Swiss-Prot record:
Compositionally biased spans, kind Polar residues: 125-135
Record's protein name: Uncharacterized protein RP144
Species classification: Bacteria, Pseudomonadati, Pseudomonadota, Alphaproteobacteria, Rickettsiales
Region span, Disordered: 125-144
Length: 144
C-alpha cells in the first residue's frame, strides 16, 4: 500500500493525507485489509475487468459459431473505439433520416418540391437537352 501512496502524489499536503490513509489501513484487521484491497483493485481495474468480461462473452459466442459464421463476425477483431465510430456514424445517419422524415410530415408538398428541385439540379445540362427535338438545318439553296 505504501508503494501506491508514493506513486499517487509527491506534493507534501497530498502525501500527508496519503500517510494518514496508510496508517488507517495498517490499523485494520487482516480481513478488513483484504476487503479494502479487493475494493481498491476493483476500482483501479474496473475498465480492464469490463473489457475482460466483454472478451469472454465474445469468446463464448464464437465457440458456439461455425468457422464461416465466425468470419462474418468481424466486430470481435475491432477495437471498441472503432466499433464506437461505426455506431456513431450510424446514429448520425438515423438522426438525419428522422429529421428528413419530420420535414416531410410537417410539409409534404414542400418536401416533394425540394426533392424534385434537387433531382433536377443533379441532371447535367446535356441530359436536359436530350429530350428536346433537334431542329433540322434547312437545305441551303443552290443557285447556279
Amino acid at each position: 500500500m505504501s508503494n501506491v501512496a508514493e506513486n499517487i502524489s509527491k506534493l507534501p499536503e497530498e502525501q500527508e493525507k496519503i500517510n494518514k490513509l496508510v496508517d488507517q489501513y495498517k490499523n485494520l484487521m487482516p480481513q478488513e485489509q483484504k476487503e479494502v484491497d479487493k475494493k481498491l483493485k476493483l476500482y483501479f481495474t474496473k475498465d480492464e475487468l469490463e473489457q475482460d468480461e466483454l472478451k469472454s462473452r465474445m469468446n463464448k459466442i464464437r465457440s458456439n459459431l461455425s468457422q464461416q459464421e465466425q468470419e462474418k463476425l468481424q466486430a470481435g477483431n475491432s477495437t471498441i473505439g472503432e466499433i464506437a465510430k461505426d455506431v456513431l456514424s450510424l446514429v448520425k445517419g438515423i438522426i438525419n433520416l428522422v429529421e428528413n422524415i419530420s420535414k416531410v410530415i410537417k410539409n409534404p408538398t414542400g418536401a416533394v418540391y425540394e426533392w424534385f428541385q434537387n433531382e433536377l439540379n443533379q441532371v447535367k445540362p446535356q441530359q436536359q437537352n436530350n429530350h428536346q427535338l433537334q431542329s433540322k438545318p434547312k437545305a441551303a439553296s443552290i443557285s447556279r
